[in-house]
Amino acid sequence: MRARLFIYLLVFVCGRVTAAGFAPVSSGVLGSSVDPANSTVKFTLGAVLHTVHGTFRIKSGALRFNPASGKLSGQIAVDVRSGNTGEATRDRQMHANVLESERFPDAVFSPDRVNGRVTSRGESDVEVHGTMRVHGSDHEMTIPVRVRMQGGSVTARAKFAVPYVFWGMKDPSNFFLQVDKSVNVEVTLEGTLSR
């Protein structure tokens, strides 16, 4: 049996998608809840002389998916305040001046559809379309996602760029430090299938 499955994706900066197992519910619609403990959001930001690496934690998520129509609903939330690069001074600057994480504590991806099919076994490549709300603004996104289903587990991986300066966040560059205007995000999501 073939089933389409979503995964997000997310995030950001800041963001965004997560994967989980889908459990059958009424009318052929599949339901899923996110496993934040086994999902990761990593980011890299290029800068003169070095590259900044960091992480965010997934806060929560729940999805509903209709394989027949490709319609997907729900939300995946990333805890922006959890952003960590391993350097306290840089992290304080990032949270206070770029992310404004006290004012905007979450980045939320709200998917609306899946393009492509997910097989019940093995790997599948799909695109997940939806809206990313980050730093108080909504941004339409289509995220390529690789989904692997094996036995009772699901793994989803997504890589995408977030143009954070274009999206209204402050460029932390100064006379001595120049950084990229876009951050690369890599999301790995783990879930368990229920039948």
Please describe what each predicted stretch is.
Residues 1-7:
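Bacterial N-terminal signal peptides that target proteins for export
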Residues 1, 15-18:
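N-terminal cationic amphipathic segment used for targeting or macromolecule association
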